[in-house]
Amino acid sequence: TAYAAKHYFDEIHYLDIVDCNAGNHHKAFATNFNPEINIREITQKGLYYENGKYIETEPMEIHQPLTYPNIGPRESYLLHHEEIESLVINFPTIKRARFWMTFGQQYLTYLDVIQNIGMSRIDEVEYKAPKADGTGEEVVKIVPLQFLKAVLPNPQDLGENYEGETSIGCRIRGIKDGEEHTYYVYNNCSHEEAYKETGMQGVSYTTGVPAMIGAMMFLKGIWRKPGVWNVEQFDPDPFMEQLNQKGLPWHEEF
């Protein structure tokens, strides 16, 4: 978004962040990162920004097919993702900002079951468990979602058999020199290539590499000034250059 604002727009009006995982890990149900965080994130209410206010939606209420490069159309669901909250502050011409993520029908079916049987609960429940010394039972307290995390596949172990790719980008509409323009910047990341390089799947790769680059920008003094800042408040050019060099090459469509 910052790169687009610097190079291609006088005003950004509409921003859609689009996140597609078109991979297959060959598991009946698994999350690509911490199950506790992932399930809580997608079962909470959706949120987007429009005309100066935030609009809340029911979980997964708003969805539409979006077409992703080299992947094709995938059903995409509006979620609450916190980066929108800073972007609309730092780019105040934005009229609407939304975040979209893809999910397959099998994943959503399992998610419905998890919710319906109470396994997505984050409050404590009492459970009778055998005592460690084998002398009987005792009442212990467990959080259902934390227990579910313990029995689901470990996201770190998914990479070996993961096939396909991710596609993450920003679709932007705004004004440059008095005329309306559209711009799409995105990266596609192969799960197989990510595993060959790091032993991890593509979702972990696309999460970790940008964070590493941000830390490098700070440590080298490229991104450093007094106070607390979000990444979009710094010069985007060196960051985008490093994405190309560190395994996440990006592409543009106008």
Spans of model-derived segments:
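C-terminal catalytic/substrate-binding lobe primarily of soluble NAD(P)-dependent oxidoreductases
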Residues: 4-254
